[in-house]
Design a protein with these regions (language model features):
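Active-site metal-binding core of divalent-cation-utilizing nuclease and nuclease-like domains
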Residues: 631-635, 687-741
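Short, conserved micro-motifs composed of acidic
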Residues: 265, 367-403
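Basic, alpha-helical interaction scaffolds
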Residues: 393-469, 487, 522-535
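Surface-exposed loop/turn segments and immediately adjacent short secondary-structure elements
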Residues: 1-146, 161, 395
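Conserved pre-motif C helix in the palm subdomain of viral-like polymerases
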Residues: 144-177, 193, 199, 223-226, ...
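Extended C-terminal regions of large enzymes
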Residues: 451, 475, 490-636, 821, ...
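Conserved catalytic palm subdomain of right-hand nucleotidyl-transferase polymerases, strongest
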Residues: 86-95, 133, 144-154, 195-239, ...
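Conserved polymerase palm-domain catalytic core
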Residues: 222-352, 371, 378
Length: 840
């Protein structure tokens, strides 16, 4: 029941690994686990209805226009379904979001029942409000302690749909009336969340250190915040914010049915407890809970703001050269969900702020986690240690010398230690990168894993930490060099292709420098835009003069905002003498660039194979010619082919022009492509009944039925002498009286056009002869041509259309060619070759 927010959670793979390697680990049994959490959730409490501040809060919004609610609008319902994540963990019903999204026939029924449940809350079945709570260890060394687990509850999908619909409606009303305090960034639409709070916090702390002035701060942490908030206060919160009575009635009734079972899995053993009836705390795992919790703490912001105390941020209303009077913005707290930081100009001010927070917390029956509450103050630009005595008698200690506090994901002392945090992030980034590359993912999933698992550990720091350009480029190089270590990238391949999109011929990795600069731009734009209407943001923009990486005072575009778009990378790739040959081939008018890059877009090959094929396309394979003229090695005076000895050993020669392997390796590649066409036609005309993998398919010489006859590599006898009488495949359509002469060619890319013309010319005489001899209406010559590197000419699509076979058949043809070309090059280089770098 911990809330679901966007803050990074600390994870330790080493701890997890050691935990999994231990066999006999003591974990709580089902009774102990249930007993502990039942004490938390089955212990109902009631907030203080007589609190003085509550009387003020209950009248705050009375003059607002009442909330209009006549059931869930159908457009909201459909939008919620559309945005569901397909395979997110389901509840105890085990029905994933995917089925609710795709079974559109039942949408009207679901919509009808959702509105019925809201109108008549007692009709809601109990099982819909039942969850399964997974217990996630917080500390691998204290697995026996039930308190050291984080409860994550998976709710029924239908419950989450209802909650999402209500959340959108409630949030729309809250935003429309600007009810949520500006200091709260949890659940605030279009805000920058934790980054926004950290930027504001950095400006305050660094300005204080720079001016050698005073600031008194305290970190407040609630003890099991989401698990301890009273149900009575949750309902009162909705009433205070004027939420429609029908919605309140539904939620109030639903809360009485909240039930969950705890589930703890350790190695192969799974513990499932008896049900716990949740009478305190709030479920996590749905869209409504975070917003509901933020509303529960919203009165605290109003109470703190009403004190008119806090740290003074001077700013000018109009930041121009014209003399303008300074204004002051008093900031006394920042909130992100339940993470609270208080700010005072004096120690007494801080104590007043803490006292208000403590009183509010006591009135709503929530407790401070004293061990996680700390003071962290600066006096005359130096650390100042002081304690705070709570009304309960507990003592909040100061951060000691050398101690840090993890605030919104970052360790702070007087300020964030950029170097230490960057070193830690880089270490974690490399660890995740290695973890990904050790696994046997296909190419597309490898790139996706790097983009979504490794790089995001850096992303959160962009705009907060001061990353230099060379550091970001070094991180990008780390991806390349690590992939090279795992034989998944050639060290001399075109670097632009690594971060180009797959449809453009790249590998689809995120450009870390671009990502950083884009986030800087977005954050700067956000603060400048908010400064037009918000005094807080205006004050931050005014005071951030090279204090944070955003440098908000300067409105001119910063160097760390410049981005290199795809077109610039494509131009750089094109201008390269060697690497640029492939993209030059792709840009020829007879080549389908999109289809030629389809194998990359699909990403089905292993990354070793993909990396090797890109190296072949980039022409940086260590052939003898490459070693002599590009690497210019002194011992490479002879560049003649190691096989045929008749031509220079270039990569084009190896892939498609060496006479020594025409009847072996080239023929094997040719026959596999031909086999795909043969099997496709045989299945289409029901000459065979079973489909097998193309590399296992052995075509029969003749397949014949009453309507069709299919020849494989068979000589056609003619009455007159014809030189070319053995096409790869011959299809005789007896019904339509048409003969198709199908011939396969896999030339090097620069020979695509001439190969097509040669094939048409080659069988012209045979076509004329067969038309008369077989008494058919037409004889059509169908060349099936694609290049050795998988480049697809437009003529291939025309040929497939003439044969009336599926237009995407070219994908299998392309895959077969690429795999065989890689096999040919590997085999070729392994024969009497000097030391070469071969991937895969």
């Amino acid at each position: 029941m911990t809330h679901n927010d966007s803050r990074p959670r600390a994870t330790s793979t080493s701890q997890t690994t050691s935990q999994n390697n231990r066999v006999n680990i003591s974990v709580p049994n089902a009774n102990d686990l249930r007993k502990f959490w039942a004490r938390v959730w089955e212990n109902p409490v009631h907030h203080d209805d007589n609190a003085n501040w509550l009387q003020i809060e209950q009248t705050r919004y009375l003059n607002l226009e009442p909330m209009n609610f006549q059931g869930i609008p159908v457009e909201v319902f459909h939008d919620v379904l559309k945005n569901l994540q397909n395979w997110k963990a389901p509840g105890s019903d085990n029905i994933h979001n995917f089925w609710y999204k795709k079974f559109t026939y039942i949408h009207p029924v679901i919509y009808k029942y959702i509105n019925k449940f809201i109108e008549y809350p007692h009709t809601l079945p109990d099982y819909i409000a039942t969850g399964t709570t997974f217990m996630i260890p917080k500390d691998a060394n204290r697995l026996s302690d039930p308190a050291k687990y984080r409860p994550i509850t998976c709710l029924q999908t239908i419950y989450k749909i209802i909650a999402s619909c209500l959340s959108r409606i409630i949030l729309g009303y809250i935003d429309k009336n600007n009810m949520l305090a500006e200091q709260q960034k949890g659940c605030r639409k279009y805000s920058q969340g934790c980054k926004e709070q950290l930027t504001i916090d950095s400006v305050l702390l660094k300005q204080t250190l720079k001016k050698k002035s005073d600031i008194y701060t305290m970190y407040i942490d609630y003890k099991k915040a989401f698990d301890s908030v009273p149900h009575s206060w949750l309902i009162k919160t909705l009433e205070i914010h004027c939420i429609h009575p029908q919605i309140i009635s539904f939620l109030k009734n639903t809360m009485t049915k909240w039930t969950t079972r705890l589930r703890l899995t350790q190695n192969t053993n799974t513990i499932i407890t008896e049900p716990i009836h949740v009478q305190r705390g709030i479920f996590q795992g749905d869209a409504l809970s975070p917003l509901w919790f933020c509303l529960a703490l919203n009165p605290l912001s109003h109470m703190l703001n009403s004190l008119n105390k806090g740290y003074n941020l001077p700013y000018k209303e109009n930041n121009t050269e014209i003399r303008t009077e300074f204004s002051n913005y008093k900031l006394n707290h920042l909130l992100y969900m339940d993470d609270i930081k208080l700010y005072g100009s004096t120690q007494q001010e801080l104590q007043d702020l803490v006292k208000v927070t403590e009183n509010f917390s006591q009135d709503i029956c929530m407790e401070f986690g004293i061990d996680k509450c700390k003071t962290n103050s600066i006096k005359n630009g130096q650390r100042y240690q002081h304690q705070y005595h709570m009304q309960t008698g507990s003592l909040i200690e100061a951060l000691s010398e050398g101690e840090v506090y993890k605030y919104l994901g970052y360790n702070q002392a007087l300020e964030i230690s950029h170097k230490d945090v960057k070193d830690s992030l880089t270490k974690d980034f490399k660890h995740r990168l290695n973890t990904i590359l050790k696994n046997y993912l296909n190419s597309k999933n490898t790139s996706k894993a790097i983009n979504t698992f490794a790089i995001p550990i850096l992303t959160y720091s962009f705009g907060i930490l001061n990353w230099r350009k060379n550091e970001l480029k070094s991180l990008q190089r780390t991806i390349n060099t690590t992939m090279t270590q795992y034989r998944k990238h050639h060290p001399r391949s075109c670097i632009q292709r690594m971060t180009l999109t797959r449809k453009d011929g790249g590998r689809g990795l995120i450009d870390i420098l671009n990502l950083h600069n884009k986030q800087i731009t977005n954050l700067r734009s956000y603060f400048h835009r908010k400064a037009l209407t918000s005094s807080l943001h205006k004050a931050i923009v005014f005071n951030d003069n090279k204090i944070t990486p955003l440098n908000l005072t300067d409105k001119v575009q910063q160097r760390n905002e410049i981005q290199i778009n795809n077109q610039i990378k494509l131009n750089e790739w094109t201008q390269k003498a060697l690497h640029g040959r492939h993209i030059h081939d792709l840009n020829q008018p007879n080549v389908d660039k999109i289809a030629s890059n389809e194998w990359l877009k699909r990403g089905e090959l292993f990354p070793e194979t993909e990396g090797f094929m890109l190296a072949i396309q980039d022409q940086i394979i260590e052939t003898k010619n490459y070693r002599k003229y590009i690497m210019k090695l002194g011992n490479s005076s002879d560049d003649s082919c190691r096989k045929c000895k008749s031509s220079a050993e270039t990569i084009q020669h190896v892939t498609g022009a060496c006479r020594a392997i025409v009847q072996t390796d080239y023929k094997h590649r040719h026959d596999q492509v031909a086999a795909i066409i043969h099997q496709t036609l045989a299945l289409k005309y029901k000459l065979i009944s079973e489909k097998v993998a193309y590399y296992k398919y052995t075509p029969q010489t003749v397949l014949d039925t009453a309507g069709y006859k299919l020849y494989w590599d068979r000589t056609i006898l003619t009455d007159k002498t014809v030189h070319c009488i053995r096409p790869d495949i011959t299809l005789h359509d007896k019904k339509q009286e048409i003969v198709y002469l199908i011939d396969i060619a896999i030339p090097n890319t620069h020979n695509l056009s001439t190969s097509h013309t040669e094939k048409i010319t080659k069988y012209t005489d045979l076509a004329i002869e067969l038309k008369t001899q077989w008494k058919v209406k037409a004889v059509k010559t169908i060349p099936i041509i694609l290049s050795t590197t998988g480049v697809i000419p437009y003529t291939l699509h025309t040929s497939l259309k003439l044969l009336d076979i599926h237009p995407l058949t070219y994908i299998n043809l392309q895959k077969a060619v690429i795999l065989n070309t890689c096999r040919i090059v590997r085999k070729f280089l392994s024969i009497d070759a000097p030391t070469t770098i071969v991937l895969g």
